[in-house]
């Protein structure tokens, strides 16, 4: 079972999880992209995770498509908005008697850095800073990392970002890589353009990621 905490539009209650997840959670001072959220892997992630753990999940949306890692560094509007939303969710749950068993961020980012030719070492260092700074500020125990896929027409373009993600998960015990499937979908015809995927692809990644996140928490 899953719920959404709407930190921007309705912060005084929980809503049953539905897609598009976070469709109206737009803050002009932070993450703001009206009309851009048309599909997601959140429901499949939550369903797969709760099937293994038996513990309900509360999700908080703060996703911004097409954003480079530099836009998420400590002190930026996106970073501050994400921390603000996470803290509001935690405060709401605690004030209403919920027991928070696990707290994590789910992260899937890097395609824009591939397009921008961000050097791998810069991307890796900035990503590590963003993830650990956010986890500390938001009280999250882990980062559930979903590896990005490939640009459909230039499949080598995102390899440095993928390699950086592999290294971070190998080196950092609190960064958990839960899916590598996105890079397989171009060959399966599951991309709708050079950058985006069809909903069955998101469902497959969400399901795999949810199962592996549950295995991490159940270990």
What is each stretch, according to the model?
Residues 1-219:
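Cell-envelope and extracellular/periplasmic
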């Amino acid at each position: 079972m899953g719920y959404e905490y709407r930190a921007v539009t309705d912060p005084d209650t929980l809503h049953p999880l539905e897609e598009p997840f976070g469709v109206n959670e737009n803050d002009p001072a932070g993450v703001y992209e009206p009309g851009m959220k048309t599909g997601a892997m959140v429901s499949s992630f939550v369903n797969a995770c709760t099937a293994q753990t038996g513990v309900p999940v509360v999700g908080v949306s703060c996703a911004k498509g097409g954003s480079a890692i530099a836009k998420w560094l400590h002190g930026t509007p996106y970073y501050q908005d994400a921390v603000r939303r996470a803290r509001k969710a935690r405060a709401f749950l605690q004030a209403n008697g919920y027991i928070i068993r696990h707290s994590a961020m789910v992260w899937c980012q890097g395609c824009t850095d591939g397009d921008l030719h961000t050097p791998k070492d810069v991307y890796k260092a900035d990503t590590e800073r963003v993830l650990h700074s956010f986890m500390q500020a938001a009280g999250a125990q882990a980062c559930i990392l979903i590896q990005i896929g490939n640009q459909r027409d230039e499949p080598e373009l995102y390899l440095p970002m993928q390699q950086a993600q592999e290294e971070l998960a190998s080196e950092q015990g609190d960064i958990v890589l839960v899916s590598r499937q996105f890079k397989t979908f171009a060959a399966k015809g599951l991309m709708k353009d050079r950058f985006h995927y069809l909903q069955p692809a998101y469902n497959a990644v969400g399901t795999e990621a949810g199962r592996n996140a549950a295995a991490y928490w159940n270990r």
